[in-house]
Amino acid sequence: MEEPASADPPRIFWKSRRRSASANGRSLQQELNKEAADEQLNNQAHEEAMKIDDANAVSTDDDVHPDPKANLSEKRKALFEPLEPINGKRSSAEMLLPPPDFEPASYPKGWLVGKKRKLVNVDVVESMRRIAIQEMNRKDREINGLNEQLEEDSRVLELLQKQLADERKKRTEIEKENSMLHEQVSMLMNMLDENEAFDEEGEAPPPDTL
């Protein structure tokens, strides 16, 4: 029998395997890098979408609550100014009047209405102030008249009190005179009674003569 021919050992290509392993490692690294890049792109897209949503929400809030003075001109803003200044000083009616070279055609209608409304308010306040001053003056005149009448009444009362004191004094003097006259009359009556008694005793006849 012939000996079987020894089979050649399989060739192992170490270099080719190393190359394939390195190629597989590079492909994995590329895939990882690609996934990281895709994730970063997705995050950026998500952030941009969030920013767009926030901007839309802010614009929606602005649309829901618009600022009334945002798109107004200076002439329109005059309508929202208060009638009285903030510092407390009252502005005169002349300051609120339109300028001498006032042309209604060059101003919006609302501004004219607002200025007229301000002027009407000033006129009403001024008329109320004049009425209040007239009422205060009338009350002052009434108070002055009452004070004068009170002073006159006090003078009359003092005069009456003086007259009453004089009358009381006179009455006291008259009462004293009356009492003195009563005493004198009583003395005279006693003297007359005594004289009559003496006369009767003198006219009576003695008993021996009979």
UniProtKB/Swiss-Prot annotation:
Positions in coiled-coil regions: 29-49, 129-184
Subcellular location: Nucleus
GO cellular component, one term: nucleus
Entry's Gene Ontology BP terms: flower development; regulation of flower development
Disruption phenotype: Slightly shorter plant. Early flowering phenotype in long days (LD) but not in short days (SD).
Predominant location: nucleus
Induction: Follows a diurnal expression pattern; levels increase after dusk, reach a peak before dawn, and damp rapidly thereafter.
Stretches for region Disordered: 1-97
Tissue: Mostly expressed in leaves, seedlings and floral organs, and, to a lower extent, in panicle, roots, nodes, internodes, leaf joint and sheath.
Function: Regulates flowering time via a photoperiod-dependent pathway. Suppressor of flowering that upregulates HD1 and down-regulates EHD1 in long days (LD), thus leading to the down-regulation of HD3A and RFT1. Triggers OSK4-mediated HD1 phosphorylation.
Quaternary data: Interacts with OSK3 and OSK4.
Protein name listed in UniProt: Protein HEADING DATE REPRESSOR 1
Organism encoding this protein: Oryza sativa subsp. japonica
Gene label: HDR1
